[in-house]
A protein has these predicted regions:
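A short alpha-helical cap/connector motif
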Residues: 1-129, 136-157, 162-179
């Protein structure tokens, strides 16, 4: 569980959410069994709402792991979306490629292989949405590298970080105060 909310509350929230099926469910199970960090069910439901409202056409994801988020984004948005994602772990890259191929999304999702600090410098163009889900200690660096790439659409910016508040709550002086 997350250490942010009471385990029973988190369990209740997750039980009320619809289960994924098909490949996404397989990837959730694989991630759980192999301790691969992917977005949680409640986060994916929130992201689904954001995606449907914002309707990004070009997404940058920093931190691909097994490709779950990219596949999820593409499945929610369908049609006309381009997703560029970065990953440095060779095992994860191979697994992500396999999963993206199984999803039939090779034409929509591109994996840039290598350290994000370097691969981000090679990307051209602007993005409608940037999802940062990589080394939490590098978030400021990633922000600095990508903030100018975020397209301004109707004065709306969509920059998402995953698990940005967890280190705050894991500090001993705060660990029992927000549950």
């Amino acid at each position: 569980m997350s250490n942010i909310v009471n385990d029973l509350v988190e369990e209740y929230i997750r039980e009320t959410l619809a289960e994924k099926d098909g490949l996404l469910k397989e990837l959730e199970d694989y991630a759980h069994e192999n301790s691969v960090p992917i977005i949680h069910k409640e986060v994916s439901d929130l992201l689904k709402v954001i995606l449907k409202i914002h309707r990004p056409k070009r997404i940058l994801e920093i931190g691909c792991a097994i490709g779950y988020s990219s596949i999820f984004f593409a499945s929610v948005l369908g049609g006309d979306v381009e997703i560029i994602t970065t990953e440095r772990n060779e095992v994860m890259i191979e697994k992500a490629k396999e999963n993206i191929k199984r999803a039939g999304l090779e034409d929509k999702i591109t994996i840039l292989e290598g350290d994000a600090e370097e691969t981000l410098k090679t990307i051209d163009g602007e993005f409608d949405m940037i999802f940062i889900d990589a080394a939490k200690g590098q978030y400021q660096l990633f922000f600095d590298l990508v903030i100018d790439r975020l397209k301004k659409m109707h004065s709306t910016l969509c920059l998402l970080y995953r698990q940005t508040i967890i280190p705050f709550f894991l500090q001993p002086r705060y660990s029992n105060k927000f549950v």
